[in-house]
Amino acid sequence: MTFRVIIVGGGVAGLTLASAFEKAGIDYILLECRPAFDVAVGASIALSPNGARILDQLGAWEKWLKIAQPLVRWGDRNSKGELIMPRSASTPLAKALTGYDMTFGLRRSLLQTLYDNIEDKSMLLPKKSVINVTCSQEGVAVQCADGCSYEGDILVGADGTYSKVREYMWRLADRDEPGLMDPDKKAMTAEYQCLFGISKASGSIAIGDADFIYDHDRSSFIFSDNCGRICYFILQKMDRVYEMVEIPRFSQANAQAYAQRHADIQIRPDLTFGNLYEHSESSILVALEEAKFKQWSWGRIVCVGDSIHKMTPNLGAGASASIESAAALLNSIKAMFDHSPEEGPTETQIRECFAQYQKSREVRATAIVDASSMTTRLQALRGWFEFLFVRLGMPIMGSFAADMASEIWVGATMLENLAPPKASLRGTLPFNPTQGQGQRESKLKRALLGLPFLALLLVAKTATDAKYASALRGYIWESGGMTSAMGSVPLLQRFYSMKGVGDLWSLRYINYLPDFYETNYESLSQAVSSSIDVGIVMSIWSFESIRRANALTMAQIPTLFTFYGQMAGLGRVSPLYYILYYINSPIEVFKGADMRLMHLNYAIAVLPAIIVSYYIPLSAAFFWPTVSGRKSWLFVWQMHPIWTAITLYLFSRIFPSTVKEDRVHGLRRDLPVIKFSMTVLVIGAAGFWMWSRWTSPSSVARVFFPTAVPSTQAPFAACVCAILKWDMLSTFGSTFLWLGYLIWDLKYAGMMQATWVRVAIYGVAAFVALGPGAAIGLGWLWRENILAHKRHKDAVTEENLAQTR
């Protein structure tokens, strides 16, 4: 079959595509208007793991590594050049996550690497400036300024931001389908300008350093390579947003004036941009175009790379995005080529091929353009949100840049006709085409699926709204005591000296009096066992608050929920906690094994913190030998949300934070600590459950399950007992429901093979034998172990590939 592709443009996308065609055995020819393929156009370039994997497939990655510089340390700095947060070791992390370094180097060096990787150089033709394009049912013809003409079946425009091929495609489409391309003719804009340049290295900047400086309406970033050079980028917001036809061009005089105007930028406390510019070897001032074109092809013409998705440089994602698009186009063309008749594909087949290419790539490409745009405006502190996020959010997240980059890397396209490289199969963030930018699960969908939590919340609110109990509680407060089986019990009306705090807790501690001072064994058994089981729920919330995947979500602040739970009842709060968790923590947030990871110093502190702040005061409040002592301890226990937060923080300070090292070398270092802590709590809860079952004269159902809504006609003790039963039913019911949702996520991702019948049998057996708290703890541990050892069914790993062979 005679089939030829004409590529116009010998940049990153064009040369990648040429190499891919050569590997696939598809005839092509590449036309480049410049006299050589390694001309010094542009300053530096970055390659991310998503692009590195494709170069590895083509055999060019190792060649690039010999001349490129891996990114060693990443620093985010304020306008004074001071670090916003501790620097991160980027290269070990990137390689651990994906198998590839984050690298940068000169653009011309990458072009030379791609050029050298192509065996048959006769297909690469320089000095070929396109002056006309014609299409017919039989094929496409390209005429060049030197008088030569070339014919083929497909024309690919890989000729950059101001693509000539795209212009000819628009003209041809306007002739046959007027108006189709009109939106795209206004799609490109520019709001920022940037001075790109190369300078001699400064002594204070080590090889492999990268610094990003955040400032109002301007930003800058630098990279230091292993050849004594610093590549710099100085960005500033322009006076307005320029549309495509009016985007400004700048002269060298403009560039020099721009550099002088920004000479005061503090790259570091002891280094200004002016110091760098004094040793500058080259520089160019350009407007930063941004574009997301909607029509990637028409007829037999298709565009790739910057000609269809143009992004700002702040994420360093442009080159890898172009490489990905080239791979996606090759995949579609190869699939068509392999299933075409002997006489070659028809124009209809070609159009379908191009549509499939755009469908496979557009969502990710658009998401990466948007992410780059957001990063540009974030680093330029565009508004109050950006300012507050940089000042408050980023230090909490710690590795914001790496986590954001992983969203771009994970769902990357690869060449489907070539095997995935071994390096790409061993990362802790396995590539997965169903995850990452543009592939996120809908939060609205998860919110709708989580409506049963709100139903439980409504039940809890209705069942625990005992107006009679509240009224009688006020009467007891005013009278200064209550009558119980133990006789008259005077109230301890003030324990904390601060009036507001004392009144707040004094009024609420009356709710616990029947459980602590009645001789009703059923009430005591229910209160002790339920309170111990609640401690396991509190521990799980504490563990979840220190999980990397839960950064900047409501799960990170369990104190808010536990405090309100003490005020209004945990049964009213837990469904709200769980639906928020479920919405914000789909299985995709665990795409990298490091996202499951917890901060080890905090994980070690959870068990002692819970024991000191929750279980010791609780035990003393129930079993202290004197009534006055029990009342005092009850006041202490009531404020356990505050004490837990304080003790967890203080105990965690005893141990150093190792999360940076653990993300690279210790992904499961926290697991033994978590297992030990939860096992201790489960054993304790199971022991009390068994004790209450064996010693109680009443059935489990009578002791722990409500038989009716609290009645206004019942005695105060009976009313409070019924309220507690409903409160615990909502608390434990919503927790089991939450675990069910989490198991559903695991099964949907193919990470759990157990059937629902098996899960139900295990759950019911654990509940009956060990109690709700122990069953919850074991179920949560089961899930934790799966997250630590299993990967998503669509992840490109050695294990998954072996199963598909």
UniProtKB/Swiss-Prot annotation:
Enzyme Commission designation: 1.-.-.-
GO MF annotations, alphabetized: FAD binding; monooxygenase activity
UniProt-annotated catalytic positions: 214
- What does the UniProt entry say about where the protein is found? Membrane
According to the record, which residues are glycosylated?
A: 132
Q: Which InterPro entries match?
A: FAD-bd, FAD/NAD-bd_sf, FAD_mOase_fung
The protein's UniProt keywords, in alphabetical order, are: FAD, Flavoprotein, Glycoprotein, Membrane, Monooxygenase, Oxidoreductase, Signal, Transmembrane, Transmembrane helix
Q: Which Pfam families match?
A: FAD_binding_3
Pathway assigned to this chain's UniProt record: Secondary metabolite biosynthesis; terpenoid biosynthesis; Mycotoxin biosynthesis
Q: What's the protein's topology in the membrane?
A: Multi-pass membrane protein
Q: Where are the transmembrane segments?
A: 551-571, 604-624, 632-652, 671-691, 703-723, 726-746, 761-781
PANTHER family, alphabetized = FAD-BINDING DOMAIN-CONTAINING PROTEIN-RELATED, FAD-DEPENDENT MONOOXYGENASE ASQG-RELATED
What protein name applies here?
Answer: FAD-dependent monooxygenase verC1
Q: Species name for this entry?
A: Penicillium polonicum
